[in-house]
Design a protein with these regions (language model features):
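Glycine-rich phosphate-binding loops of nucleotide-dependent enzymes
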Residues: 1-217
Length: 217
C-alpha cells in the first residue's frame, strides 16, 4: 500500500498457523500498524491478497472482516469510557446476537431474550479476566492495566479466529507487563486463539511469541 506516492508496506508475506502466537516487530514507522489496518479493512491494499482460513477477504469492509473472524485491540486504548465495563463487552457481542431496530424500540420479546443472552456472555468473559466485580463501573474508572484487559475481552466478544494485539504493553509497568504476558498465554490456550502481536517490549515478545517477523524501512 502507498500513501501519496510513499510505499508504506511492500512485499509483505506471512502465514500464521492456527493456534500460533506470532510476533511482528520493527522500528517505529516500519508499517506494523498499517499492516493491522490492512488486515482489518481500515485500508484496502493496492495489490496482493489477504486470506483467512482460505477465504479471500481482501478489500472487504471492516465490519465484514470482523464477522469473518478478525478482531483487534489498539495501541491507544479505544474503550467507550462513558459506558460501563459490561456494556463495553456487549458492544462486541452485537454481531452475533442481533435484533432489529424495531424490536429494540418496541421492546419486543426477542429484544429481552437477546439482551439476557448478551448479559450472560459478557459476564462470562469478564469473569475470565477477573473483571466481573467491576462490571457496572465506568470503563474510565478502571486502572490502566485492567482497561487493556477489557479491550481484549471486548475483542474476544466478537468470537474471532485471529486476534490482533497492537502494542498491548504500551504504558505498562513491569508488573503489569508480566500479568499481560500471562493473560495473552491464557487467552491463546483457553480460546484456542491465533494471535498476531505487535510489540516493542522485547522481553514480552521473546517470552510468549513462537515465531517472529521483523519489518524494516
Amino acid at each position: 500500500i502507498s500513501f501519496g506516492g510513499l510505499r508504506a508496506v511492500n512485499a509483505f508475506d506471512i502465514e500464521i498457523e492456527k493456534g500460533q502466537l506470532y510476533g511482528l516487530i520493527g522500528p517505529n514507522g516500519a508499517g506494523k500498524t498499517t499492516i493491522f489496518n490492512l488486515l482489518t479493512g481500515v485500508y484496502k491494499p493496492d495489490e496482493g491478497i489477504i486470506k483467512l482460513d482460505g477465504e479471500n477477504i481482501t478489500g472487504k469492509k471492516a465490519i465484514d472482516i470482523n464477522k469473518a473472524g478478525i478482531a483487534r485491540t489498539f495501541q491507544n486504548i479505544r474503550l467507550f469510557k462513558d459506558m460501563s465495563v459490561k456494556d463495553n463487552v456487549k458492544v462486541g457481542l452485537h454481531n452475533h446476537h442481533p435484533y432489529s431496530t424495531l424490536e429494540g424500540i418496541l421492546r419486543l420479546p426477542r429484544y429481552f431474550k437477546v439482551e439476557k443472552e448478551m448479559d450472560e456472555r459478557a459476564m462470562e468473559l469478564l469473569k475470565v479476566f477477573d473483571l466481573d466485580q467491576e462490571a457496572d463501573l465506568l470503563a474510565s474508572n478502571l486502572p490502566y492495566g485492567k482497561q487493556r484487559k477489557l479491550e481484549i475481552a471486548r475483542a474476544l466478544a466478537t468470537d474471532p479466529k485471529l486476534l490482533l494485539l497492537d502494542e498491548p504493553a504500551a504504558g505498562m509497568n513491569p508488573n503489569e507487563t508480566k500479568e499481560l504476558m500471562d493473560t495473552i498465554r491464557f487467552v491463546r490456550d483457553k480460546f484456542d486463539m491465533t494471535i498476531l502481536l505487535i510489540e516493542h517490549d522485547m522481553k514480552l515478545v521473546s517470552g510468549i511469541c513462537e515465531k517472529l517477523t521483523v519489518l524494516n524501512f
